[in-house]
């Protein structure tokens, strides 16, 4: 009996001790669920949700290397060797939905390296040749090329002028602006109305910017003004823009038509007129009162596209360029291009040679 009581008492003591230890034990919290990156397919391929938000982000860019030879078709000068250029561009897009429409941003950073012909006439570096032209140079630079915000149809920030973007660029050509259709980068506030029937309209207030050695920014509170109308359908599109340069108090206009002949072959034609017959302005930078551009694109195969552009202005400059863009593998395109410029009329006395032939090969990896 005493042994039984002893055993029962020992068991009770052990149970009590176990309960006390359990009461003192630290209970580890349940691990929080890990929030993995989610794919966002509302705005196209490549977007994902920024963790903890409903904002979609896409990161993209390209690495490019250009090799140029022959003449400079913009100036008529002989390169006397190879010119090289490299660029790394990094782009960020964000989008989210609000009660006022889609709120978006776009930024692009460019890291550039250029190396001009560094050895000819027996000299090196920054010496000059017999024409007092620099014997060679290397330059690097970093630019915030684009940085703008969009909300519905509104856009504000650093972008390219609506004088270019609304009508469309001058073909899929590298040397596309030998005859310039206006300056590009500018600060602006713009609104684009897009109807459901293919009709759209734009109005923009622009600051202007620097282009090569010229400054076309406004000199007071009055901005440059751009307005345009467009109609687009399955057959193509027709668009027109009018721009007022507040510095020289003159205007310029462009009208462009695009036609899709087939799903692989398209053509386009653009005409322009300026009230000031000088290239030294923000918009009408061709020579004289008028200029015309035209081109075509033919998708020869799934990998190869042929592009052609021709242009002529009132002062007598003629430019023709052709290339073949070949996608070697997905994301990597090689583009050989040949350009010719005839400097006639009033351009003839501004260049060393009347005729210029130049070539370029571009290697570009896009991601």
Swiss-Prot record:
GO CC terms of this entry: cell outer membrane; pore complex
Annotated GO biological process: monoatomic ion transport
Location of the protein in the cell: Cell outer membrane
Protein name in the entry: Porin Omp2b
Key words of the record: Cell outer membrane, Ion transport, Membrane, Porin, Signal, Transmembrane, Transmembrane beta strand, Transport
Top-rank taxon, per record: Bacteria
Endpoints of the signal sequence: 1-22
Domain notes from UniProt: Consists of 16-stranded beta-barrel sheets, with large surface-exposed loops, that form a transmembrane pore at the center of each barrel. The pore is partially ocluded by a peptide loop that folds into the pore lumen.
Quaternary structure annotation from Swiss-Prot or TrEMBL: Homotrimer.
Role description: Forms passive diffusion pores that allow small molecular weight hydrophilic materials across the outer membrane.
Keyword Transmembrane: yes
Membrane topology qualifier: Multi-pass membrane protein
Main location: membrane
Family: Belongs to the alphaproteobacteria porin family.
GO molecular function, a single term: porin activity
Pfam short name (any one): Porin_2
UniProt keyword annotation of RNA-binding present: no
């Amino acid at each position: 009996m005493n042994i039984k009581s002893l055993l029962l008492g020992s068991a009770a003591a052990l149970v009590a001790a176990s309960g006390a230890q359990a009461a003192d034990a630290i209970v580890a919290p349940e691990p929080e669920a890990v929030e993995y990156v989610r794919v966002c397919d509302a705005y196209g391929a490549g977007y994902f949700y920024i963790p903890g938000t409903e904002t979609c982000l896409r990161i993209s860019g390209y690495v490019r290397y250009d090799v140029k030879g022959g003449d400079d078709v913009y100036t008529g000068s002989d390169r006397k060797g190879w010119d090289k250029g490299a660029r790394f561009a990094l782009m960020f897009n964000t989008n989210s939905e609000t009660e006022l429409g889609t709120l978006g941003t776009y930024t692009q950073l460019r890291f550039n390296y250029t190396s001009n012909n560094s050895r000819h006439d027996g000299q090196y570096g920054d010496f000059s040749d017999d024409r007092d032209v620099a014997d060679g140079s290397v330059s690097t630079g970093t630019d915030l090329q684009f940085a703008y915000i969009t909300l519905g149809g509104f856009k504000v920030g650093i972008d390219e002028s609506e004088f270019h973007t609304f009508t469309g660029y001058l073909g899929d050509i590298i040397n596309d602006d030998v005859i310039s259709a206006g300056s590009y980068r500018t600060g602006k506030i713009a609104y684009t109305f897009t109807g459901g029937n293919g009709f759209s309209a734009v109005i923009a207030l622009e600051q202007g910017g620097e282009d090569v050695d010229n400054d076309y920014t406004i000199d007071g509170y009055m901005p440059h003004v751009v307005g345009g109308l467009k109609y687009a359908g399955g057959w193509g599109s027709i668009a027109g823009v009018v721009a007022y340069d507040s510095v020289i108090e003159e205007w310029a206009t462009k009208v462009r038509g695009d036609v899709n002949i087939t799903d692989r072959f398209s053509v386009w034609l653009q005409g322009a007129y300026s009230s000031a017959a000088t290239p030294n302005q923000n918009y009408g930078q061709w020579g004289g009162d008028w200029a015309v551009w035209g081109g075509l694109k033919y998708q020869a195969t799934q990998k190869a596209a042929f592009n052609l552009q021709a242009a002529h202005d009132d002062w007598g400059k003629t430019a023709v360029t052709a290339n073949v863009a070949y996608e070697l593998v997905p994301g990597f395109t090689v583009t050989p291009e040949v350009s010719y410029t005839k400097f006639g009329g009033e351009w003839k006395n501004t260049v060393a040679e009347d005729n210029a032939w130049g070539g370029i090969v571009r290697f570009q990896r896009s991601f």
